[in-house]
């Protein structure tokens, strides 16, 4: 399992550079490529990435205090895939608990990178590494371990990745019956008042690839 998870992480780091290139092109011509950002998600076990935004926030706070543990963390990138600048977990990772989002920024201290806080304050690098955030904002490309797919039988929110969502909150993304979002939201700080809306089922994944299948053994492989 360790070998498979390490391989998955390396694939994520390499593929993020591709998604960054796509997002740079989209931002340059939104009238051609649309307003929705291209994003990539990392969907692996709880020991690697957080399940919830609260868990992500707690892990980042520990890292800011210099307490690097062995638990899950949102710091899956050590350098910006676009420009190579260092990414410090305590400085370049931020959690917006009102939006329920974890943002990862490029560490370029001069603010020249397209994904630095100076140029991309509202999004940062187009990555999603927290399970709940992946369900609410399904990424353009998702890299996962096969055991996460096996959770579909008892985790209803996973269905959102396959288009099974009928409501959307402009602030929090797609909703499922057990979602924490309680519906409409009043204005809060810089956040505008929003209303939850009914939506038609979204498009499920066009392609699913099972890589390195020979590494899976036991009941899960069967």
Walk through the language-model features, giving the residues of each.
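SF2 helicase catalytic motif II
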Residues: 139, 147, 161-183, 198-222
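Cys/His-rich short segments
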Residues: 50-131, 162-197
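Short secondary-structure boundary/capping segments
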Residues: 14-19, 55-61, 156-161, 222
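Conserved motor-coupling elements within RecA-like helicase/translocase cores
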Residues: 133-138
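Short helix/loop capping segments that flank catalytic or ligand/cofactor-binding pockets
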Residues: 8-10, 51-52, 116, 151-154, ...
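Structured core elements
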Residues: 1, 39-43, 79-82, 105, ...
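Conserved Walker A/P-loop ATP-binding site and its immediately adjacent core
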Residues: 1-23, 41-48, 144-154
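Short, glycine/acidic-rich hinge or "gate" loops at secondary-structure transitions
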Residues: 25-37
């Amino acid at each position: 399992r360790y070998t498979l998870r390490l391989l998955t992480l390396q694939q994520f780091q390499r593929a993020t550079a591709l998604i960054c290139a796509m997002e740079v092109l989209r931002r340059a011509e939104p009238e051609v490529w649309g307003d929705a950002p291209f994003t990539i998600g990392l969907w692996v076990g709880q020991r690697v990435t957080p399940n919830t935004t609260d868990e992500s926030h707690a892990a980042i706070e520990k890292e800011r205090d210099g307490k690097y543990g062995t638990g899950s963390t949102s710091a899956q990138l050590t350098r910006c895939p676009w420009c190579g600048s260092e990414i410090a977990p305590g400085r370049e990772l931020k959690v917006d608990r009102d939006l329920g989002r974890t943002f990862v920024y490029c560490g370029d201290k001069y603010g020249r990178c397209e994904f630095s806080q100076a140029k991309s304050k509202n999004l940062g690098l187009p990555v999603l590494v927290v399970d709940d955030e992946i369900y609410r904002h399904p990424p353009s490309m998702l890299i996962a371990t096969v055991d996460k797919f096996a959770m579909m039988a008892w985790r209803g929110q996973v269905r959102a990745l396959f288009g099974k969502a009928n409501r959307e909150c402009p602030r929090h993304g797609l909703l499922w019956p057990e979602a924490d979002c309680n519906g409409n939201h009043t204005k809060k700080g810089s956040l505008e008042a929003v209303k939850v809306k009914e939506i038609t089922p979204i498009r499920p994944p066009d392609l699913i690839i099972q890589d390195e299948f020979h590494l899976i053994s036991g009941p899960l492989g069967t």
